A protein has these predicted regions:
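Short, amphipathic alpha-helical "recognition" segments used to contact nucleic acids or chromatin
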Residues: 6-16, 175-189, 242-257, 295-307
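Basic amphipathic alpha-helical segments that dock to polyanions
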Residues: 59-73, 212-214, 280, 331
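A short, conserved structural fragment
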Residues: 65-78, 219-220, 286, 332-335
Length: 335
């Protein structure tokens, strides 16, 4: 069993009841459907949400079949369920994941950072012609704007200092896994597979180790941005975490449109608009959204471990299901 199996089994085990492939895929890949956003919080797996955005459904299915053949998972009519008492270490090994909170930010930040390191290093080595390590045009545009009107020598020195501080202050367990991803001068950064082969570990250990350190750093930056001025400037806005449709709804809401007006303007079902507000509240815990229950009621609801929305409805009959979903995703903390 490798770290990917550990991740899959951990999510599955926390859900308690059988879960089908589409559900597991949306959680692991971080597809922000209304159901996925709600269930990730209901089953308290939001910290594990979206750690594998490039995951393919067929690949996940093949893994689940392997786990079934190994006797770790049972496949039932209602979905997959962990059927052994095997001890899992994913959360113990990686206690600081904040998957839902940093889902998009983590990957975009690291892409920005890798390209920034390459550009500044190549400038230092007077290397004018090279292939960008990141081909994404949005990332390239971000770094181009980031570099504008700045002294690149000063920038390079400051970035080096903050990277060194990252490794030192956060006591990064396996710094080589991070450092060897960077490119500059005549050195080309290694892939996850190349690093795994070099250090004789499985590739998923490298993958999750690097991602976990990025999440740890983002948490530190969020608490004390002034201590990481340059690295903080490479972190994309939290707004990028929202789906484009939810962002459109949020923009209308911030500009004074009420729920009915948004429904008319966007020509969407009210249930879809409600999904957007559930996603918005899950992303921004302080966001004011339509028909949000009061804070004391939200706290009361989230003091218990619920498995079904109808259980909450039975206990709080005056709330509709939209309000219940808002309360569920409002829970503070990442686990």
């Amino acid at each position: 069993m490798d770290k990917l199996d550990d991740y899959i089994l951990t999510v599955l085990k926390k859900c308690i009841t059988p879960r089908k492939l589409p559900f597991l895929y949306t959680i692991l890949a971080g597809r922000r459907t209304g159901q996925a956003v709600q269930d990730a919080h209901l089953f308290q797996v939001q910290h594990l949400f979206g750690l594998m955005p490039n995951l393919k459904s067929r690949f996940l299915e093949a893994r689940l079949i392997e786990l079934t053949d190994q006797g770790m998972v049972a496949s039932t009519e209602n979905g997959y369920i962990v059927q052994t008492d095997i001890e899992l270490f994913f959360e113990q090994d990686y206690p600081n994941f904040q998957g839902f909170a940093f889902q998009r930010q983590a990957f975009d930040f690291f892409a920005h950072l890798r390209l920034a390191v390459q550009v500044l290093s190549n400038k230092h080595h007077q290397k004018s012609y090279y292939l960008p390590i990141i081909r994404d045009k949005k990332v390239q545009g971000f770094i181009k704007n980031w570099l504008r009107n700045k002294d690149q020598t000063v920038l390079a020195n400051q970035l080096y200092e903050e990277l060194f501080e990252w490794i030192k202050k956060l006591n990064v367990a396996k710094p080589a896994f991070l450092i060897e991803r960077f490119s500059g001068g005549d050195l080309m950064g290694n892939t996850t597979e190349q690093i795994a082969a070099k250090y004789q570990v499985e590739k998923w250990e490298v993958y999750f180790e690097v991602l976990h350190e990025i999440h740890r750093l983002l948490a530190f930056i969020k608490k004390n941005p002034q201590d990481w001025a340059l690295l903080e400037s490479l972190v994309p806005s939290e707004i990028t975490a929202l789906t484009s449709s939810a962002l459109q709804t949020y923009t209308l809401w911030q500009n004074g449109a009420d729920l009915d007006t948004i429904e008319q303007i966007r020509n969407l079902k009210i249930s879809t608009i409600q999904d957007h507000f559930v996603e918005i509240r899950a992303t921004y815990k302080e966001a004011s959204v339509p028909y949000l229950p009061d804070e004391e009621l939200i706290k009361t609801i989230n003091q218990s471990n619920w498995r079904l929305l109808r259980e909450i409805k039975a206990a709080f009959p005056d709330l509709d299901y939209y309000q219940i979903r808002l309360a569920v995703v409002s829970k503070e903390g990442d686990k």
